């Protein structure tokens, strides 16, 4: 099995280092990852300037670009073969509920899926530096073997979130759906020493709806959450209702 690894925390992140270590035990690994942190870039693709890549290890490439760039460049140029699987992570911080729409980690898995390659995004549920990246990486490695053996439904990729706990303390994985988060955005508005305004986009304390069966419900109770995500964003349940509208 040959696996392409990437992330959005950057090529030198501890989560990626843990993933390399654990996945290398079950597969041949090549890393194509951003040269710096690219958190919250979602599915951004670099189109207005050239991409540059540097080989910084035997099978490790650092790219001046987004996670989506890395998957594109890896599959279409840097690798001499088509990987059997793409794994993105281990992200520092959860990618659950509505946050998946912002996530560069999840978007890298989406990009691989668009190319017809099975993919997994894996994140460590923590608001601090994170302690148990290896436990999350071990979960990803085990799941990679299962996905390689069984395959995934068409246009489907997996979003995995692992509580920041020692491996022996993790509860069994649960198959979940995407949850819901309540956003109360804030803008930090300041003035620099030259009298110019500058801003930071921030949020107040975040809250999630604790709904049984969701990713948040699982991880908040110590379970590993595995959510099957899909390329098709259509709300199929609303189609018939919208057809009844008197559209202009």
From Swiss-Prot:
Keywords: Cytoplasm, Hydrolase, Metal-binding, Nucleotide-binding. It is an enzyme of class 3 (hydrolase). It holds the Pfam family SurE. Binds 1 divalent metal cation per subunit. One of its GO terms (molecular function) is nucleotide binding. It is found in: Cytoplasm. One of its GO terms (cellular component) is cytoplasm. Its EC number is 3.1.3.5. It comes from the Bacteria. The keyword Hydrolase applies. Signal peptide: none annotated. The keyword Zinc does not apply. Its main location: cytoplasm. A divalent metal cation binds at residues 8-9, 39, 91. Its cofactor is a divalent metal cation. InterPro entries: SurE, SurE-like_Pase/nucleotidase, SurE-like_sf. It catalyses: a ribonucleoside 5'-phosphate + H2O = a ribonucleoside + phosphate. Belongs to the SurE nucleotidase family. Nucleotidase that shows phosphatase activity on nucleoside 5'-monophosphates. This is 5'-nucleotidase SurE. It comes from Citrifermentans bemidjiense (strain ATCC BAA-1014 / DSM 16622 / JCM 12645 / Bem) (Geobacter bemidjiensis). The lineage of its organism: Bacteria, Pseudomonadati, Thermodesulfobacteriota, Desulfuromonadia, Geobacterales.
